[in-house]
UniProtKB/Swiss-Prot annotation:
The modification Phosphoserine is found at S32, S88. This is Hsp90 co-chaperone Cdc37-like 1. It comes from Mus musculus (Mouse). Residues 1-42 are annotated as: Disordered. Keywords: Chaperone, Coiled coil, Cytoplasm, Phosphoprotein. Residues 27-40 have a biased composition (Low complexity). The gene is Cdc37l1. Residues 2-170 are annotated as: Self-association. PANTHER family: CDC37-RELATED, HSP90 CO-CHAPERONE CDC37-LIKE 1.
C-alpha cells in the first residue's frame, strides 16, 4: 500500500521563469509532476515532526555557540595572559582560568544531555494515539484563523527570496558565501536558516544524501551567525563577517565547534529519516496544484521548544525519480 507523501514545504513556493532544468528536477512541490496528494492528517503529522526536529536543531546550535565558542574565547584570553609575567595580571589570569573551568563543565553537561536525547530518539517507539490526538488538537479547525504579523512576515520573506536562499545553500566556498551575504544582507536571518534546515530533511527523505550534506553546511553556517549575533547582542548583519574570518582562518576552538555541530546535524537528519523507515515508492497519480497556501501549512505549526520531546510522526515516503549524483553535480556547477 502506498504511503502518504510529505506535504509541501518551503521548497514548494512558485518558481521564477529563470529556473534551470536541474533545479526543477529537485522540485517535488505540489506543482511538480512528482507530487502525490496526501491526506490532511498525514500531512499534519509529517509537518509537525519536521518542525519539532527543526526546533531541536536550533537548540543544539544555540548550545554550541554559547558553550564551545565562549570556551574558545576564554582559552584565547587565557593564552594571551600567559605571555605576560606582570603581577598586576595575576587576578585577570585567575578569573580567566575560572571562566574556562565553568565553561568546560557546561560543555560536558550539554554533551551528556545531547547523548541522552539521541539515545532516546533511537529507542523511542512512536505513540500513534498521542500523535493522532496532538494532530487533532492542532488542526486547522482548532487554530486561530488570525495569523500574527510575525508569521505573515516570515511567510512572505521565504516566498519572496526562495531562489536567493537556494542559491546561498549551494555555495561551497567561504569567500563565495561571505560575498553573497554582503550583496544580500537581508538574507542573514532566521527565515533563511529555517528554510535550509527544512530543505535538508526533505533531501534526506528523497535519498539525496550528497546534496543534503551541501545544504547542511550552509544551514549550520547561517545558524552559527544568528546565534553569534544573539550571544553578542548585535545585529547579525553586522557580525557575519566575523564568523567567516574565524572560519577561513580555522581558528582553534571556533572552527572545531562548527565542524562538530555540522556532523551532529547531519547525523540527526539521517537518524530522523531512518526512524521513519523511509521506503521509495512509485507515484502513479500526478495531481497539479497551484501551491497557494503552502507556506501557511508550514508556519502554523507549533513553535514551543518545550515540546521537542514529543513523538514524531508516522512514516513518509519518497519518489522513484531520485536525482542521480551527476544531476546533483550539475546543479552545483550552475550556481
Amino acid at each position: 500500500m502506498e504511503q502518504p507523501w510529505p506535504p509541501p514545504g518551503p521548497w514548494s513556493f512558485p518558481r521564477t521563469g529563470g529556473e534551470t532544468e536541474e533545479e526543477s528536477d529537485l522540485d517535488v512541490s505540489p506543482s511538480s509532476s512528482h507530487y502525490s496528494p496526501v491526506p490532511d492528517g498525514g500531512a499534519q503529522m509529517y509537518s509537525h515532526g519536521i518542525e519539532l526536529a527543526c526546533q531541536k536543531q536550533k537548540e543544539f546550535v544555540k548550545s554550541s555557540v554559547a558553550c564551545k565558542w565562549n570556551l574558545a574565547e576564554a582559552q584565547q584570553k587565557l593564552g594571551s595572559l600567559a605571555l605576560h609575567n606582570s603581577e598586576s595580571l595575576d587576578q585577570e589570569h585567575a578569573k580567566a582560568q575560572t571562566a574556562v573551568s565553568e565553561l568546560r563543565q557546561r560543555e560536558e553537561e550539554w554533551r551528556q544531555k545531547e547523548e541522552a536525547l539521541v539515545q532516546r530518539e533511537r529507542m523511542c517507539l512512536w505513540n500513534m494515539d498521542a500523535i493522532s490526538k496532538d494532530v487533532f488538537n492542532k488542526s486547522f479547525i482548532n487554530q486561530d484563523k488570525r495569523k500574527t504579523e510575525e508569521e505573515d512576515k516570515s511567510q512572505s520573506f521565504m516566498q519572496k527570496y526562495e531562489q536567493k536562499i537556494r542559491h546561498f545553500g549551494m555555495l561551497s566556498r567561504w569567500d563565495d558565501s561571505q560575498r553573497f551575504l554582503s550583496d544580500h544582507p537581508h538574507l542573514v536571518c532566521e527565515e533563511t536558516a529555517k528554510y535550509l534546515i527544512l530543505w535538508c530533511f526533505h533531501l534526506e527523505a528523497e535519498q539525496k544524501g550528497a546534496l543534503m550534506e551541501q545544504i547542511a553546511h550552509q544551514a549550520v553556517v547561517m545558524q552559527f551567525i544568528m546565534e553569534m549575533a544573539k550571544n553578542c547582542n548585535v545585529d547579525p548583519r553586522g557580525c557575519f563577517r566575523l564568523f567567516f574570518q574565524k572560519a577561513k582562518a580555522e581558528e582553534e576552538g571556533y572552527f572545531e565547534a562548527f565542524k562538530n555541530e555540522l556532523e551532529a546535524f547531519k547525523s540527526r537528519v539521517r537518524l530522523y529519516a531512518q526512524s521513519q523507515s523511509l521506503q521509495p515508492v512509485t507515484v502513479q497519480n500526478h495531481v497539479p496544484h497551484s501551491g497557494v497556501g503552502c507556506i501557511g501549512s508550514l508556519e502554523s505549526l507549533p513553535q514551543n521548544p518545550d515540546s521537542l520531546q514529543c513523538c514524531t510522526p508516522a512514516p513518509l515516503c519518497s519518489v522513484d525519480s531520485v536525482v542521480h549524483k551527476e544531476d546533483d553535480d550539475r546543479m552545483m556547477d550552475t550556481v
